Amino acid sequence: MKNIKCLSVVFALCLVAASFGGAVSADSDASPLSGLPGGAGKPVVMVKYGNSKPDRPHYNLNQADLFYVEEVEWGLTRIAAMFNTKFPSVVGPTRSARISDLEILEQFTSPGIAYSGANDVLLKAIRKSQSISLSPSDRSSFYYRNLSKVAPYNQLLRLSSMMEKETKVGPIKDVGLTFDRNVPAGGVAAKTFSASWPSSKVSGTWGGKSWTVSFDGSLHRDAVSKALLTPKTVVLQFVERKESKYGDRFGGKTPLLKSVGAGRAIVLRNGQSFDGSWSRPTSESGTTFSFANSQIAFDVGQVMIVFVDGGVKKPPFTVK
């Protein structure tokens, strides 16, 4: 009886603690990229998606733990999607890698990068990096073409089958992000956001539980499930945009988006905006996002990070 009474007291104390808003953080085995369960210790793979109109709809982008929207040549954007907790059966359409991808990947240990190809100069940089190249030249049996579309917008990857046999990609590590379902204090109500480039636009609307994302004014619907793209947290990360020595075969210059450094960051979660900062001191370190002089936690779930040019007086973005 004494043991039963003691257990009852402990249970009651737990209920009292919970009623006072104890942290509802990510599970101990959670992904360092989303806070979702099951990612700790598993491999991490970046998949390069095209993001022009002919590339869409995307396959299983909504299952990525985190994805970046990056400017490329001609004012277009591409998507660098990080998969860790789940490796869907099919992803894509896969497109070519860019120099900004390598700087993102330097914070991991032997991460995979799945992409359709790259020019000779960038291919040499990929081979010299610590990233594990998973292009069709490296893993040809897992790539195929969707014959209902034309190249280069139709190359798909059987990601889950590839990862079942993959031995070179390293396990994910902590990259500086924190997750908590409790809403931080000090936010300002925000129901919509947008960021734009000369030939591309991303926008979103708060839907009560997550953000609903559109590209070029059209709601994103998955090619497989038809589900909407609904990240829990959206970050507008203002980065240095530099000209690089890389470009496409048509003469377009590839911008280098510096994810190492520091700058402004607007974190959007739970229908609120937190105008703060980001810091990544070295290429090997992760990124810390802060608000009101403290690290800010993301909501548990998918994260979308949009690289915005921080070097112009009026960056093309809105938060309302």
What do these predicted ranges mean?
Residues M1-V10:
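Bacterial N-terminal signal peptides that target proteins for export
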Residues A18-A30:
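Sec-dependent signal peptide cleavage junction
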Residues V10-S19:
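Bacterial N-terminal signal peptides
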